[in-house]
């Protein structure tokens, strides 16, 4: 079981010239994105999944060689500048789905707000639109199905939940998640063309703070 700094993982054969890096702790997701963004020899492609990374090599490598490449790359690219950040996001809990969620969950609206805002969430990955972050950590009583009929448009800053995840819509888009409220917290900066275009990154943590 290799370790790089405090990150523990396994590297498993996954077909010709392919290897699967499987995290022992899914919360170390930031390491997978560090590898994906890094440029290192012999690796042709990196595909990030929920808690694993598929590495395709440009030529046959042994398991020991792949382990060494991964270890060296993580050591080189994991620095204080790459530390995970914590965000506090203020939310106006006035979303149009609060009452429906209260009925479905048999909770009061205030109980929903309290549950949602008392959790600490981690950014698992960025999803279907620019800057949209899938968040782990949603309390179990709020893990409810998405809407049966998606809305044609969710506003930027819409704070929502769907299934096991929470999320914040970063751009106007259709959406079937349950809309709890809105935030002015900037998530997407289209004028930037590097990683700073997105405020949230895999491995970051956040909490929601109710405001009136």
PLM regions and their residue ranges:
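Glycine-rich active-site loops that engage anionic ligands at enzyme catalytic sites
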Residues: 2-212
């Amino acid at each position: 079981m290799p370790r790089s700094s405090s990150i523990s993982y396994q590297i498993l054969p996954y077909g010709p010239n392919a290897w699967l890096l499987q995290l022992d702790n899914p919360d170390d997701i930031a390491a997978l994105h560090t590898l994906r963004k890094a440029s290192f020899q012999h690796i042709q492609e990196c595909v990030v999944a929920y808690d694993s990374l598929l590495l395709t090599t440009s030529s046959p490598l042994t398991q020991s060689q792949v382990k060494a490449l991964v270890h060296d790359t993580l050591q080189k690219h994991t620095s204080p500048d790459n530390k995970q950040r914590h965000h506090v996001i203020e939310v106006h809990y006035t979303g149009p789905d609060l009452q429906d969620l209260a009925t479905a969950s048999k909770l009061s609206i205030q109980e929903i707000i309290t549950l949602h805002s008392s959790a600490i969430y981690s950014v698992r990955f960025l999803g279907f639109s620019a800057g949209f972050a899938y968040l782990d950590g949603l309390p179990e009583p709020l893990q409810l199905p998405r809407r049966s009929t998606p809305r044609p448009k969710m506003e930027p800053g819409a704070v929502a939940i769907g299934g096991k995840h929470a999320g914040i819509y970063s751009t106007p888009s259709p959406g079937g998640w349950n809309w709890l409220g809105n935030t002015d917290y900037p998530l997407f900066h289209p004028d930037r063309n590097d990683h700073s275009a997105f405020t949230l990154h895999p491995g970051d943590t956040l909490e929601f703070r109710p405001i009136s």
